[in-house]
Amino acid sequence: MLARYFRNLYQRTMSEAYGLAIDTISGSLEQEGNVLDCGAHNGKMFATLSEKNGINKERYFGIEWDQGLVKEATEKGLNVIQGDLNKGLPYPDEEFKCVFALSLLEHLINPCRYLKECYRVLQDDGLLVILTPNISTYFTAFLILLGKMPSSGPQPDSDTLIKKEEIFKVSSESLQPDTESDTPIHRHFIVFSYRVLRDYLESIGFNEVKGYGFGLYPFPNFLQPLLEKIDPYHCHQMVFVAYKSKSNSK
């Protein structure tokens, strides 16, 4: 019963967070300009964006670590390349109108370097959209008081330990830990707090940085919309929308 309760909380949280992020990305593409999908998987976001605002393949670019997923994307005719986002973005300055990373930042070893690269490749008045978990939650504090590790990460390089520490499995049953592989896709390395991520985005030149919180656990779903507005700082997931201003361009 309790596991189902938290699973419902999680599913609602992710649905709302992704919904806002996708609507924001889609809205930014109503004007001319290209979009960069970081952690593009097999290009699945292209279908969503194309359906929402009719973006064509020529405006969609993606970068993905997994070569098999890159192959799937290119077979669809999408411009998705293989690359390691810890090592910079292989694109020229001011190339994109919008750059987005959904559930990606926590998987990087060098997330601050990555965010600087996002700033570099964005056009003036370009938009960055980030969706990532928040380490500074009441639920995390509760786990630490119990002597356990934060469920949001960082995570150790042991699948057995991660499964042992997991109180409830709220994600899909098909999503299994892969931390012991040579190329872990699901492992969380660095997890920001709401205030730290907001302040860092501002420090590297972004302005109009707006953050949103989703999922203030353990409160029930019917209270979430109100609580998320009152206290976005301690929600389970956070979405940040940030503009590269002409006046702040470095």
Label the predicted regions.
Residues 103-107:
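A short His-aromatic
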